[in-house]
Amino acid sequence: MRRLLSCLVLSLGLLAGTAHADVAKLYFGAGFSDGSVDITNGSDKSLGTLSATVGLQLLDFVGVEVEVGSASDQSGSILSDPLVTYQAVMLRLSYRLDRAGVYLLGGQARLDIDDQFNNSDAGNVFGFGINLFGNETTALNFHVLDFDDGAFSTATIGFQYYFGGFR
């Protein structure tokens, strides 16, 4: 038990040092997407989805991203009574061009599907995206995510704000 606690304290100290490094490497975003949930009879159901993202660029090409989202087939119930909710923690590998950036995402997600689809699961999430920068700090964002081998997928358009700019 003592060894476990000392390992946890050491890892927390290392992570806190990285997190304290630079606020300029933080970014956040929001988006609206068309989500698709796989129904047990083999068909797909299209859902409107709202999502929010927070991320930290650790290096120029490596970052960590957390995304949460909520989806429903009725626009009035996306936040109040969603059919699907998800939370994902992903590693982000990115490459920046002049005014654009492309990236790959991969990680773990928790997916809750309700209202007779009855699927609550944790699994892998993979995706890719592109940022088109209008100025130094704000980007138009397009990305696609695939949860748990196709159980749920999203194609998102939104924005991302980079505190330190994209350079």
Residue ranges of each PLM-predicted region?
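Residues that act as N-cap/strand-start positions at coil-to-secondary-structure junctions
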Residues: 48-50, 85-87, 124
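Predominantly the C-terminal beta-signal and adjacent terminal strand-loop region
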Residues: 72-77, 122, 126-167
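Solvent-exposed loop/turn segments connecting transmembrane beta-strands
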Residues: 39-45, 77-83, 96, 114-122, ...
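Outer-membrane beta-barrel porins/channels
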Residues: 83-90, 151, 160-161
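Short glycine/proline- and aromatic-enriched beta-strand/turn motifs that initiate or cap beta-hairpins
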Residues: 20-64, 68-74, 93-94, 101-104, ...
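Mid-chain, well-packed structural core segment of small domains
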Residues: 101-115, 119-123
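Short, contiguous, well-ordered secondary-structure segments
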Residues: 84-105, 146
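Cleavable N-terminal export/targeting peptides
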Residues: 1-25, 166-167
